[in-house]
């Protein structure tokens, strides 16, 4: 086995090895958290080295257990998977740092279980990122669902259990009824489940492809396209580090990553643009963008507002994939990274506010920015990135998505994306504005001693906010990975 293949497998195995260390150190919080941080650092090192190897032109793949002829556990590194794995590994480190401050500051129980499930989830993310076929993708997709269920129900309350049932029910139902059926249909029709540049279907299989496309889009429930989005707001009962994991690092990104990969490597854009079901799904995704934004405006609970914002932003990426042109794929790939940093910043800030002030409702946060200036400033920066305004990195991904709608002659969708950005302004910017400029009703009351969240959490949210700015000033690495993805998928210049 070559060293590159060993590194590939280690990216999946290192988080699992961390599980053993976390359990062994369960009675010693400092050691337990050191194990988690160390594993995250090792994962970043491995992922970055794989990035360098593939940039030099080396093909890295590994085939393992073969279930049936043509159906094997297969990993293959390509640019979109690298982009996803780099984001996942880096944000695992930052989220672990944040969790140390949050879990201790909030005096959460079962912290060892939390770190164990988190590590298993990250291992699943690496498996999804490097999956070389639909079979491998499906296995790790399901492991990710099951490993995050205990995180959603972490509090152990009836509300948490109900949220967990909705979470598990929707994600397992969609994946088994639709996604698994789509994979079987692909294998039967095309004779393969491997991801291939240009897709696996030919023109004679257009009808079958048109039937299978909705099964994939609805079956990948983690992409949260309406009406299969309810699991996402239901999961907001989880601790904030879990919400950050769900919305930025792992679960939803696994969803839209899978949608983008299926559209490019299973259908191919030449065929995708000809399918009658593509048009329907494209406008359904556009409707999800607007409807979720409107629902977000009505939420007073901060995490609920951010949850519906996530539903809307994920549909941007689905729109990019279904537009079936290179600008859409480029914008969708870049938005995976841009949204990750913007949204994780917002959730980190929401958690910091809850730990420091015990406030969860936006209407109670007037004047809070004067006592938590770093947190509220970070929230402002994250908001700009989600909206798509400088100096937020989301500016660039939304730019390419707008270009894609023009190139595809979908002016209605261009208006939808513009209207959504205006709605983003309406439901995000008033929060820091009121936090800094409105009078603080508790300035002389019982809450006058409220200050910033614990230092580890404050460092984490500051780093992700800085990341939003860095991705605006220096988007080249993300852009280059996205363009390499276009080349690998045979889309460059399309």
Go through the PLM ranges and name each one.
Residues 29-40, 162-172, 244, 371-376, ...:
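Alpha-helical transmembrane segments and their helix-start/interface "positive-inside/aromatic belt" motifs
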Residues 94-112, 118-137, 147-399, 403-434:
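Hydrophobic transmembrane alpha-helices and their helix-loop junctions in integral membrane proteins
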Residues 37-51, 173-182, 382, 463-477:
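Hydrophobic alpha-helical membrane-insertion segments
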Residues 89, 251, 397, 460-462:
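Core segments of transmembrane alpha-helices
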Residues 1-7, 19-116, 191-200, 483-492:
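Transmembrane helix-loop-helix hairpins at membrane boundaries of multipass inner-membrane proteins
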Residues 370-376, 429-494:
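Cytoplasmic/organellar membrane-interface segments at the starts of transmembrane helices
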Residues 142:
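Short phosphate-coordinating micro-motif centered on Lys-Gly-acidic
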Residues 11-12, 210, 223, 471-472:
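Hydrophobic alpha-helical transmembrane segments of integral membrane proteins
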